[in-house]
Amino acid sequence: MTDQRRNVYFFHKQDQETNEQARSLTQLAEEHGFTVVNQHSDANIIASIGGDGTFLQAVRKTNFRDDCLYVGITKKGKAHLYCDFHSDEREKMVDAMTFEQIEVRKYPLIEVTVDQASPFHCLNEVSIRSSIIKTFVMDVLIDDLHFETFRGDGMIISTPTGSTAYNKSVAGAVVDPLLPCMQVSELASLNNNTYRTLGSPFVLSSDRKLTLRVVQDGNEHPIIGLDNEALSTRNVKTIEIKLSNKKIKTVKLKDNSFWEKVKRTFL
């Protein structure tokens, strides 16, 4: 698997501690026949040094490439869902690569189109929230058919791997990443005798399209979060969300499954 992939790009924060770890990892990579490159466009392996947040940034800043492998390396021995390697476990990294103790997982992306502009991609989730202290109103359509009119603080639409992040904090379900789907979770929905929403998360298959039409009532400048970045505030009328045909490939240890990571992180 790695025989044809020898060009490595390290993505990391520019602080003294991380720079030292990057230099150490660069030396390790070069000792084992890899070439460390300065531009991510020249790489076929992109390794992030940090936590899950750094991994998300690495994927976004390198344009969600589907022609390379992404590797998560954490700086400290804490549990991370996207990072299978620790920077202080050099021998384990070498053994994993040498003896093929790794496998490649393909993770789906969410594709977000705002008012028919160029689409954005997300690995974890897209969130749409009110930017002012006022109930946010959206018409929710599934495959262009009206499903409900949402009133509340906003919504989160997550991938299976993203289901353990923001989505879980609002009582969304944790979804197996082998299921190609996206989950829709509400933020403080308004439910009474006059207004009604489903009131629970729901899951859409990879063939479905979700459309959110923002009611133009003075609250049409929502905060749109794309993973751990915010989209510039703008007047928004329609947001279309679907599971992208594009996927990223990540390297994971064979003995470190998604559910083992979930158990280690939350239980």
Swiss-Prot record:
Active site feature: 52
Which cofactor(s) does the record list? a divalent metal cation
Its UniProt entry gives the catalysed reaction(s) as: NAD(+) + ATP = ADP + NADP(+) + H(+)
Q: What is its EC number?
A: 2.7.1.23
Localization, per the record, is: Cytoplasm
Q: Name one GO cellular component term.
A: cytoplasm
| A Pfam family assignment | NAD_kinase_C
One example of the protein's molecular function in GO is: NAD binding
What processes does the entry annotate via GO biological process terms? NAD metabolic process; NADP biosynthetic process
Which parts of the sequence bind NAD(+)?
52-53, 124-125, 151, 153, 164-169, 188
Highest taxon in the source lineage: Bacteria
Q: Which UniProt keywords apply?
A: ATP-binding, Cytoplasm, Kinase, NAD, NADP, Nucleotide-binding, Transferase
Q: Which HAMAP family match?
A: NAD_kinase
**What is the recorded function of this protein according to its Swiss-Prot or TrEMBL entry?**
Involved in the regulation of the intracellular balance of NAD and NADP, and is a key enzyme in the biosynthesis of NADP. Catalyzes specifically the phosphorylation on 2'-hydroxyl of the adenosine moiety of NAD to yield NADP.
NCBIfam families, sorted: PRK03501.1, PRK04885.1
Task: Write out the similarity annotation.
Answer: Belongs to the NAD kinase family.
Please report the name of this protein according to its UniProt entry. Answer: NAD kinase 2
